[in-house]
């Protein structure tokens, strides 16, 4: 809607003016990514955190902060224009810094996908058991956030998930291949 009125009042109908509208649509389509079980879970078991994730994604987009939206394995990755602040996951919505893409070889996505797996497993307990403690540690921890138990659990879940689907995934970077699990940034 914002893009329509901008074009109407400025008579500038270039494709750049429709970027946030396209991103809003892609964010909305995130509700319907994945298999039937993932979609059903999103509307029931994971509904509280999914609503917050969708709201956060659309709010970022409202202020023209969303660069791209991509999907993988039921998750929606929302890439922002901001550099190197990290990311956070609420339900199936992963919001992260510039460079985030829904790709198993994307280091930030790997880790955040682990939080999505936590959400799927814990349902309505996710916010209290994982999201809030992780956020609190990010804000008030002693600088070793990647070793916090919630983060370690996310890493363990994600590496197990990806290793099951991509044989040898856990060791590829150790062999000098620029794909697979990023052990340096996301240790187990």
Segments from the language model and where they lie:
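Short pre-active-site segment immediately N-terminal to the catalytic Zn-binding motif
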Residues: 86-87, 94-110
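Metalloprotease/metallohydrolase-associated module, dominated by Zn2+-dependent proteases
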Residues: 23-67, 74-85, 89-91, 98, ...
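Extended, hydrophobic alpha-helical membrane-active domains that insert into or remodel lipid bilayers
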Residues: 1-37, 103
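Acidic active-site catalytic centers that drive phospho-/nucleotidyl reactions
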Residues: 111-112, 151
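Polar low-complexity intrinsically disordered regions
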Residues: 1-10, 114, 160, 175, ...
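Catalytic Zn2+-binding segment of zinc metalloproteases
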Residues: 113-132
